[in-house]
Amino acid sequence: MPSCISVNKKGSIKVGDGAYNDMKQDKRRATKTWRIGASNTYVEFKRTMATNTNYVCTNKNCNYTSEELSAEVLKTLKSFVTDETFSSVVITVPAKFTVNQKTATIEAAKMAGFKHCELLQEPIAASMAYGLTAEEKNGIWMVFDFGGGTFDAALLKVADGIMQVFETEGD
């Protein structure tokens, strides 16, 4: 599901594929890229977490923060799980996210109805998914994450099933 949001003329919000299709028809209605304030600057809302940036909906008189937009994406993802109630979530974030951006991400999770949120840096999550904590994979590892618009890396040491993070870096 693309992290894309659109708002129609009545103010209804779409998230995901429907919003992405709206964006193809009219970039002003949907975004990873919404206009900031009165300028004509378009940016991805993930990149402005914790900056007090307001995104202006050009076809409706409405403003949203990055946290509010992120919460809409999380609510939609949560709705995909049928007949299950859960209140905890693990979210991956870019390696370069600041403490304020991480705090804003946790706030977005709360807005989406999650009571508990854990954050993992994207290259760390990738190394866990690959199974680097397995004992037969002892050694020093460089893990790259070529994510949607970011390039992150982590330098890890794995010994006896324990992963130690030396450094993470990204853009």
PLM region spans:
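Amphipathic alpha-helical blocks
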Residues: 49-51
